[in-house]
Amino acid sequence: MDYLPIFVELKGRLVLLVGGGEVAARKATLLLRAGALLQVVAPELCSELQQRYQAGELEWYQGEFQPEYLDGIFLVIAATDDRILNHQVFSEADKRSILVNVVDDQVHCSFIFPSIIDRSPVLVAISSAGKAPVLARLIREKLEALLPSSLGTMAKIAGKWRERVKQRLTSMRQRRSFWEQAFNGRFAMLVANGQIQQAEKQLEQQLEQSDLQGELALVGAGPGDPGLLTLKGLQVIQQADVVLYDHLVSSDVLDLIRRDADKICVGKRAGNHSVSQEETNRLIVKFARQGKKVVRLKGGDPFIFGRGGEELQVAASAGIPFQVVPGITAAIGATAYAGIPLTHREHSQSITFITGHCREKGNELDWPALARGHQTLVIYMGTVKAALISHQLILHGRAEDTPVAVIGCGTRLEQQVLTGTLLELEQLAQQAPSPALLVVGEVAQLHHQIAWFGQQSIAKISRPAVVDFA
């Protein structure tokens, strides 16, 4: 972090603005809105600053900058087109440990101005640390569209009710849940519609019925890239009191969870169940009965080889309200990022998803059906059983030279795609980083032509594996 983002109280503080042109006028508008006692040093003032001076909104020292003008000053801005003068202002202010900003000269700044979204008393500040001001402006424009104009009014009402809520709800968790419900519910809608009295009545009713009920949200985290987490998924994990997450959830997605939420890893890996499913079920019920918002965060989609349905059955049996937020499953996300279309008119007319967590004999899968041509087979958690899968498919008629791909860390910056043939599947799987997805079918060869993300060089096995299942 190059800069510490802070909000500075300027009401009643002396601020010196050196410069009298249009740029200085824009800074003056911002400073006066923040309540600063503004002093301007310039030989002449532009029309806007002249009007403010005549209205008594600022003091004007007509003439050149003098170091003694810094006496008693809290903050300084140099906004002239004279570089030598700007550098002098910076030097004199810096010697006195006074915060100083030289417009469009980051080297001579002890602080910089962010892009601002003003929904007072709510303020959003966006900065690129001076590296990309246009990018910061574009981010601000996107956020402006997302944040309702009623946000400030909502915050003012909340401020008025804050002490009353604090007296009624003694724990921080209760208060947080109360306000989250208010800001996401009918209260917010009424404020947005300008129905302020009705909005306050809604708050009063909510406060009278403030007994907290726990709930469960089953959320799909997607395959790894945090940009593939759904908007609803992001909203839910940022409201959670407790997040029970799997190993497959990427660290980038975990970073999006609200900082004061309890994060508990209940992940299971092949051959190593660090937390049993029974213990996970117990934790869901335990925390929800404490009135907490519990998020069960699973890699990919929670209903595809994630045991999400079993966990919802437990919640339903315990009388715990729940919701499901789908996620982009690895078979969709990882193959897209690898440049492997799951269907193609010339190569594949159907898709089958299977899990590699199968018994050694492999009797539970319909291998003859899986071995048919002109289809794409995607195997989750198949690294350990890659040799068995390859053997069974070849045994039941799939050609040894069928193209395959193993996608390790799909959609993440460290993504690797290894391609080869079905006969080489075990060796490819052993080389790929975890988590890995196995793709069998002619579409795998299209990676060479339309790979677009991350490491596009292809690792390919040249010698076939020799596996004896006799």
Curated annotation (Swiss-Prot):
It catalyses: uroporphyrinogen III + 2 S-adenosyl-L-methionine = precorrin-2 + 2 S-adenosyl-L-homocysteine + H(+); precorrin-2 + NAD(+) = sirohydrochlorin + NADH + 2 H(+); siroheme + 2 H(+) = sirohydrochlorin + Fe(2+). InterPro entries: 4pyrrol_Mease, 4pyrrol_Methylase_sf, 4pyrrole_Mease_sub1, 4pyrrole_Mease_sub2, CobA/CysG_C, NAD(P)-bd_dom_sf, Siro_Cobalamin_biosynth, Sirohaem_synt_dimer_dom_sf. S-adenosyl-L-methionine binds at residues 223, 299-301, 304, 329-330, 381, 410. Residues 1-203 are annotated as: Precorrin-2 dehydrogenase /sirohydrochlorin ferrochelatase. Its EC number is 2.1.1.107, 1.3.1.76, 4.99.1.4. GO terms for molecular function: NAD binding; precorrin-2 dehydrogenase activity; sirohydrochlorin ferrochelatase activity; uroporphyrin-III C-methyltransferase activity. The modification Phosphoserine is found at residue 128. One of its GO terms (biological process) is siroheme biosynthetic process. The active site is at 246 (proton acceptor), 268 (proton donor). Residues 214-470 are annotated as: Uroporphyrinogen-III C-methyltransferase. Pathway: Cofactor biosynthesis; adenosylcobalamin biosynthesis; precorrin-2 from uroporphyrinogen III: step 1/1; Cofactor biosynthesis; adenosylcobalamin biosynthesis; sirohydrochlorin from precorrin-2: step 1/1; Porphyrin-containing compound metabolism; siroheme biosynthesis; precorrin-2 from uroporphyrinogen III: step 1/1; Porphyrin-containing compound metabolism; siroheme biosynthesis; siroheme from sirohydrochlorin: step 1/1. CDD domains: SUMT. SUPFAM superfamilies: NAD(P)-binding Rossmann-fold domains (SSF51735), Siroheme synthase middle domains-like (SSF75615), Tetrapyrrole methylase (SSF53790). In the N-terminal section; belongs to the precorrin-2 dehydrogenase / sirohydrochlorin ferrochelatase family. In the C-terminal section; belongs to the precorrin methyltransferase family. PANTHER family: SIROHEME SYNTHASE (PTHR45790:SF1), SIROHEME SYNTHASE-RELATED (PTHR45790). Then it catalyzes the NAD-dependent ring dehydrogenation of precorrin-2 to yield sirohydrochlorin. Finally, it catalyzes the ferrochelation of sirohydrochlorin to yield siroheme. This is Siroheme synthase. It comes from Photorhabdus laumondii subsp. laumondii (strain DSM 15139 / CIP 105565 / TT01). The gene is cysG.
